[in-house]
Structure formats: structure tokens, C-alpha cells
Amino acid sequence: MVAAAGVRPGELVLDIGAGEGALTAHLVRAGARVVAVELNPRRACMLRERFPGITVLHADATAIRLPGRPFRVVANPPYGISSALLHTLLAPGSRLVAADLVLQRAVARKYAVGAARRFSLTVGLSLPRRAFLPPPHVDSSVLVVRRRR
């Protein structure tokens, strides 16, 4: 997913809902400047210990202040915050360049159909339930968001 997202070394990337760091590890290996956002205090502490070179925010992802410079998001956020998160990321003034978000497949399809003036939204890779531990009750897809030029 990180390779498909086109993450480049030195690029600022948010991992929202970082959990135990599965995506974070790939982002670090890609050379990204990672900001991991995690609501669970134990997981946030574990992320700090496991990845000392990144910034970890113990915070509600829907309440964080987005970076004031261009950034990407590569994340598997909690499904319950998908709509609020997309509203924030796509809001006027956001410096979002691109996002690759693992979402509930129905939500990804809904947003891909919607019109967005400043961004293109498409459904990318489909992920079956068995791709996750523990498996969710729904299938997932990557929502690919790119800023229009």
C-alpha cells in the first residue's frame, strides 16, 4: 500500500489510527517523515518506543490540527471516523496532496462517486476481510485521493 501510494523519502505523511504500527513501519522504511496519530494511550506509547524517529500524537484524529504545509495520508483509520476524517482532509484550506485510506468498501465507493472540485477520489485495491487480524465484519477498499492540479 505504501509503494502504491508513491510515498517519497522526506515526505510528510500522517498515519491516522496507527495502532501497533503495521503501516508506520512501511512508511519509516520508505523514508517518510511520519506523524502517527493514535487515540489509545498504550498503543501511542508503544509507537514512541518502537519508532523513536517519528512524531506520535496521542489524539482523536478528527480533532487534530492538520499540517500547514503539504502532506500525505496513508492510513487504515477506524471505520467509525471515516466521514468526519474525510470532511476534515478535504476541507478548504487543507494542504493535503494525496491520501490512501483503507475504508469500509461501501464508504469508499460512496465517496468515489461524489463530486470533489479540488480532489479526485477513486476506489483502489480491494481488501477482503481475511486480510486483517482480527477480521472486520465488512470488506474494505483503499480510497485513493489526489489533489487536482
What are these model-derived regions, one by one?
Residues 1-149:
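Catalytic cores of RNA-modifying enzymes
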